[in-house]
């Protein structure tokens, strides 16, 4: 039986949407200054973010860029077996701050997808918290 998931993590930052988008767009490249775990690298294919072409790999996730709208969102489609859905970063205004939300919306197959999410769920939560903490430090520089 397929299992739907909808998981979000968010935080508001003092940085501009332009700067925060730039930091997110550079993740997995030589310009990445916010991925928190050097021993568990975040990698993406080289070049500009191009839907249908740019790929990413991290924490057991393999995804292809589905949509990019500068200063608004970067959305990836899972390529992992048993997972049908997306995860991405969404930027919005929160009074004088910029809110960043990472949202995962997917349907998991009963076997592969459920096992994949079980392995990923805890590290995903820690990664989001650490990423947001590092982004906050970088934006204060």
Tell me what each language-model feature is.
Residues 20-30, 65, 74-76, 100-102, ...:
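Hydrophobic pocket/interface hotspot
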Residues 14-18, 66-71, 90-99, 137-140:
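A short, structured loop/turn motif at beta-sheet edges
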Residues 37-44, 132-141:
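Short, highly charged C-terminal tails/helix-capping segments
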Residues 43, 64-66:
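A structural signal for short, hydrophobic beta-strand segments that form beta-sheets
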Residues 1-46:
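Hydrophobic ligand-binding cavity/cleft-lining segments
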Residues 79-130:
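Beta-strand/loop substructures that line and gate deep hydrophobic ligand-binding cavities in soluble
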